[in-house]
């Protein structure tokens, strides 16, 4: 039996789904089972989705515990995910064993408790799963189109950081020279927009502005 966590990516809009799968056949063609994910696959076509196996595990409990540490409430609040429920809750839609769905669930928490204990006491393991959950977001954030969608998402509009949070952010940014010089995501870049295509994007300041495009960023068309 193979146990693994995986990531499904919509190649058209870069939205993702993180899930788990148990199977005896790694070539079973499994492409996720989330409700929103299935709707998107019907809409865009399964050929426009890619699958990446994140990590293999020795047992189901360790697999679910790993998913729990990736698909958190913070993860679910992101606008670029298809996940609807917290990770680690189990269920049987991820299992691919003939006749398994007709058998009683034989739940053993031994593996999960062992993994949880190891996770809570292993800083390197915590960092590993934190990176899995954040690396995709960082890659998406590097694209102007994603940032615009994220910032305009209704769940994040009219929300403000508390003074305490703002001070913590300032202290953190001061320590790592956040957004200074070449670390600034805008370094050497400029915004241009097209009224015909109704889109804004970044280009290098040294690049010529294409015909029909204008300098500056436009949020609404």
From Swiss-Prot:
The Swiss-Prot or TrEMBL record lists the needed cofactor(s) as: Mg(2+)
Enzyme nomenclature, EC number: 3.1.-.-
- Show where the GIY-YIG domain sits: 1-84
By its UniProt entry, which InterPro entries does this protein fall under? GIY-YIG_endonuc, GIY-YIG_endonuc_sf
GO MF term list: DNA endonuclease activity
Q: What class of enzyme is it?
A: hydrolase
Q: Which UniProt keywords apply?
A: Endonuclease, Hydrolase, Magnesium, Nuclease
Q: Record's family?
A: To endonucleases of group I introns of fungi and phage.
* Protein function: Probably involved in the movement of the endonuclease-encoding DNA.
Protein name per the record: Putative endonuclease segB
Organism from which the protein derives: Enterobacteria phage T4
Q: What is the lineage of its organism?
A: Viruses, Duplodnaviria, Heunggongvirae, Uroviricota, Caudoviricetes
């Amino acid at each position: 039996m193979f146990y693994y966590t995986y990531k499904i990516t919509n190649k058209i809009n870069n939205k993702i789904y993180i899930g788990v799968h148990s199977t005896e056949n790694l070539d079973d063609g499994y492409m996720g089972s989330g409700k929103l994910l299935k709707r998107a696959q019907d809409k865009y076509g399964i050929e426009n989705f890619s699958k990446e196996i994140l990590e293999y595990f020795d047992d189901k409990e360790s697999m679910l515990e790993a998913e729990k540490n990736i698909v958190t409430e913070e993860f679910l609040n992101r606008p670029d995910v298809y996940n609807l429920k917290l990770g680690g809750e189990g269920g049987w839609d991820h299992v691919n064993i003939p006749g398994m769905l007709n058998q009683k669930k034989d739940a053993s928490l031994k593996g999960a408790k062992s993994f949880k204990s190891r996770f809570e006491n292993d800083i390197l393991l915590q960092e590993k799963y934190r990176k899995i959950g954040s690396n995709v977001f960082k890659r998406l954030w590097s694209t102007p189109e994603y940032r615009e969608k994220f910032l305009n998402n209704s769940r994040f509009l009219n929300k403000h950081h508390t003074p305490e949070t703002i001070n913590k952010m300032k202290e953190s940014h001061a320590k790592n020279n956040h957004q200074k010089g070449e670390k600034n995501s805008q370094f050497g870049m400029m915004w241009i927009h097209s009224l015909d295509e109704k889109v804004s994007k970044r280009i290098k300041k040294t690049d010529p502005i294409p015909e029909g495009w204008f300098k500056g960023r436009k949020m609404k068309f």
